Amino acid sequence: MRFGIAVFPGSNCDEDAFHAAREVFGQDAEYLWHKDADLRGADVVILPGGFAHGDYLRTGAMARFSPIMTEVRAFADRGGPVLGICNGFQILLESGLLPGAMLRNRGLKYRCEHVHLRVEQIDTPFTSAARAGQVLRIPIGHGEGNYFAPPEMLQRIETNRQVILRYADPEGRLDDAWNPNGSANAIAGLCNEARNVVGMMPHPERACEALLGGMDGRAIFDSIVGTFRSADQPPPGLPRSAGASAKAERLALQPSVVGAAGDRHPSPSSGRSASLSGERSR
């Protein structure tokens, strides 16, 4: 399968996501520059962390107008899986692909630490390998992760079971003392109603190798890779080279789909150093 990693001016976790997809999980991965109008056959799109366009106006407010986001929206509308991590989550909110908004953290401080997450829903392409109620230990690094939604919208989100991850204590109990940013209903991760678009503030790509202090983030990547590995053929009569887009369209209705592999194309940001330390202020 092929991961498409979006890169905006100011992204600094794209290298981390690429490393997880390609080096840790052995999948094809492709950088998608923000000016591109082509997802290049990606089976899954990741919007990584960072400071897209310097976070001017609001986090993600300018990135939503990038040409690549037009393609991402169309891809998501066809059922293609999209994962927004940290700043990527903020971009999904600004783009209207997920409901709600992000505010400054409670206390107005940047939080960089490991948090515990309780898995709430496992019927998404990004949580299917986890167990309901499982507690994951994954790092965060943000200044604007305080999720907000009006009461009516929040009730609809809860009714539709769109909350997939909540901040919790190490035993999985909800306790405001373990909510690092004041997020409404302790929301750490959210999906759309179709369940193919997911946003989360914690960084699973930073928790895929023991060297980095933990591997609980593998549950997120194991889920999407496992979803695509569960079937390895495009629909009857469809050339394999055309399988990626068709399989993405079918994902929401038929989770057992696999994407076509391919060679890595040169990064549009070649020459940039990897940012393994992650986001520094938001």
What function would you assign to each model-found segment?
Residues 187-211:
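A glycine-centered loop/beta-turn motif at secondary-structure junctions
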Residues 3-4, 137-141, 198-201:
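Active-site-proximal beta-strand elements of phosphoester/diester hydrolases
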Residues 236, 267-270:
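Intrinsic disorder
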Residues 50-51, 88, 143, 204:
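Active-site metal-binding loops of divalent metal-dependent hydrolases
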Residues 1-85, 93-99, 105-110, 118, ...:
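N-terminal beta1-alpha1 cap of cysteine-dependent amidohydrolase-like domains
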Residues 97-184:
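Pocket-forming structural segment of enzyme catalytic cores
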Residues 1, 132-135, 192-197:
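Beta-strand-turn-beta hairpins that frame and shape the catalytic cleft
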